[in-house]
Each structure stands twice: as structure tokens, then as C-alpha cells.
């Protein structure tokens, strides 16, 4: 697997442990007057993307958004498990993601719309986990895969 690029940012102390995951939601109004907002909202972070904490630094900050303060951490974009058409499911292939299904009431919706995946976003298929035959709608020729966003 490729060496993952890490980004230094600041997260609430509750999330500041290795392995914690979050979806970056952008700045809150309270961030405008914060001295460390530039680090917290690092220009490399992308709204709607899922990140995983890979290491925690000792630095702690007061925070108007996070009760209990915030800590400096290193994060990497998370590997995302999703369902895609078999025709796109080739290891190390770059794809433009389009959800297979848009029915929010479907039991399989979370596989078609996992947190951190963006419609029309560019991703690399890392692993093909196998066929996905559990589609409640009966859609055929689907695979369950692990993907990572294409670095920008």
C-alpha cells in the first residue's frame, strides 16, 4: 500500500486518540476569532471527507467548539468501503464515484453512500473485497471494495 500522507490539524479532545475517525465539516462561526483556526482548519482538509487520527501530539488548546478543549493530531484520509459496479472494480484503478442507488430508505444505502465519499469524487480502488449480492433492490454486477480518495 502507498505511504499515506498525513495532515496536522486540531480535533476535540474526545476524538484525539489513534484510530478515531471523523468527517470534516468545515469551520464553525466560533472559529473565526480563534488563534489556532488556521491549523484546525488546515487548507489540506476537505469538507465531507473522512479522516482517521494516526497520531496525537501533546499540545492542548482551549476551544469554543469542543468541550474539554482540543489537541493537535496527525490525520490521514480513511479507506472507505463501498459498493460499485463490477466494471469499475479493478485493484489500483482510478474511478469517478457515482452511487449505485439513491433510495435513502434502502437497507443497503450505507454501502452506496458511505460517510466521506463524494459523488463524482475521484478514488483509487485499493482492494476488491468480493461480490455484493445483498442489494435489496436486486441490482446485479456489484462489488464491495475499499477505496481511497485520489490525492489532489
UniProtKB/Swiss-Prot annotation:
UniProt superkingdom: Archaea
UniProt cross-references to PANTHER family, sorted A to Z: UPF0179 PROTEIN MJ1627
The protein's name in its UniProt record: UPF0179 protein Mlab_1307
Record Pfam families: UPF0179 (PF03684)
Family assignment from sequence similarity: Belongs to the UPF0179 family.
Amino acid at each position: 500500500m502507498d505511504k499515506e500522507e498525513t495532515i496536522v490539524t486540531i480535533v476535540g479532545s474526545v476524538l484525539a486518540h489513534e484510530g478515531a475517525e471523523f468527517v470534516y465539516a468545515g469551520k464553525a462561526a466560533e472559529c473565526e476569532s480563534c488563534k489556532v483556526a488556521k491549523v484546525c482548519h488546515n487548507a489540506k482538509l476537505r469538507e465531507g471527507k473522512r479522516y482517521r487520527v494516526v497520531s496525537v501530539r501533546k499540545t492542548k488548546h482551549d476551544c469554543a467548539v469542543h468541550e474539554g478543549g482540543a489537541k493537535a493530531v496527525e490525520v490521514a484520509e480513511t479507506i472507505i468501503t463501498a459498493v460499485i459496479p463490477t466494471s469499475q472494480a479493478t485493484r489500483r484503478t482510478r474511478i469517478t464515484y457515482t452511487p449505485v442507488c439513491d433510495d435513502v430508505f434502502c437497507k443497503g444505502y450505507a454501502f452506496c453512500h458511505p460517510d466521506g465519499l463524494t459523488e463524482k469524487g475521484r478514488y483509487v480502488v485499493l482492494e476488491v473485497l468480493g461480490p455484493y449480492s445483498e442489494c435489496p433492490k436486486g441490482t446485479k454486477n456489484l462489488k464491495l471494495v475499499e477505496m481511497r480518495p485520489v490525492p489532489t
